[in-house]
Amino acid sequence: MQITFLGTGPSFGVPVVTCDCRVCASPDKRNRRLRAGLLLNWTNLEGEESRILVDTTTDLRQQALRVCLDRVDGVLYTHHHADHVLGLDELRIFGFVHGISIPLYGLPDTMDAIRHTFEYAFDNHAHGVPRVDLNTFDGPFNLRGVHVIPIPVLHDRITISAYRIGNFAYVTDCSAIPEASAEMLHGVDILVIGALKRNTHPKHFSLDEALFEIERLKAGSAYLTHLSHEFEHEELEKELPENVHAAYDGLVLEADEPLT
């Protein structure tokens, strides 16, 4: 399975509008962070290839152009906040070109929020609207021949979804991982986890909290995402443990193909 970081930034992105700090002004492309999202490419046991988005970020059009994305076979949503869903309208072109409805997967409150925000896409079937199907889950499910495990975690007071697919897991916008969820994530080979700031934040792990969770979960390797402009990429890399890295936009990882 191929994992592409479409974006590694927070809701403001980096550079931040109006900010002239050294990170926002940095010429290093690794310090330029679109909103956090992933593209997963896998081939199931039947040889069927799939391109799956994790969240439809506010920057999805730009992200799709960067990686020459020509098809979307599904979307896994972590939660319903603006930086994770407002790019949904960019799915229109994929439905038009391929003549398909794209399945969306998320918790019930996430799907309800999407239906409300994009009600024009569901109240009629007029030309020019996204062609999508809403799907909720209450446990693991099969997505195009692959076993997907949604894992409940906390984003301040709301429950959102992390995901484990084979030996890869994605945990962003998280402030706490309940014990039962930690057991589901334990021993994962590749963990992507959010680390918004250096200081504590009510809705997101800080750097130290993310590092604590990486150790708690006994992840083989970990990649930090949802990084604010407090972090300069090269400096952050130098202070991290050997098995932990700062992700950046365009980074591609390879994981074992997930099984059904």
Place the predicted regions along the sequence by residue:
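Cap/insert and terminal regions of metallo-dependent hydrolase folds
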Residues: A176-E257
